[in-house]
Amino acid sequence: MIDSIQHRRSIRKFTDKLIDPDKLQIVLEAARLAPSGNNKQPWTFIVVQDEQRRRAVMEVCHEQSWMMSAPVFIVAVADMAERVEIKPGLCLDETSPQWELKRAIRDTAIAAGYILLEADAQGLGTCWVGFFIQSEIKPVLGIPEDKFVLGIIPVGYSAEQPAARPRKPLSEIVRFEKW
């Protein structure tokens, strides 16, 4: 597992080779098997392959044109329709009545991370895209208002292999027993 983690990079340039459907299925299966609080599995993943629809998604991602080189986008959506009332000014503090949404976001982020790692294990490149506005992305994909879009993951065969970026040392990010 650590090999995949060390090997994975954010890819922003893909070949025009289509993804083998079996590989895509395995990547999605990894997300399905991700852990979640109380096994709620509060996620939905939208697989976008149609070029016009991908273009519409790219446009609401502040026109990050590099995205169009990926043949597939996987959109990670936290699904809390039955557990949380979504309102403007939603407070995501654990003391708020909507704290379950925060849990759904955390759980969905774990599943999305599994997508990133399994895609790499399948020889595919990915990049996490979180630069968009909820009210713009939802209509493009018909996502109901009571859902929360975490991110878009362009997926494809990498046309580049970027060098490793500097990472903070463990001594800077890990504390034992307390802050």
Model-derived regions: residue spans:
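Acidic, surface-exposed loops and disordered segments
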Residues: 1-179
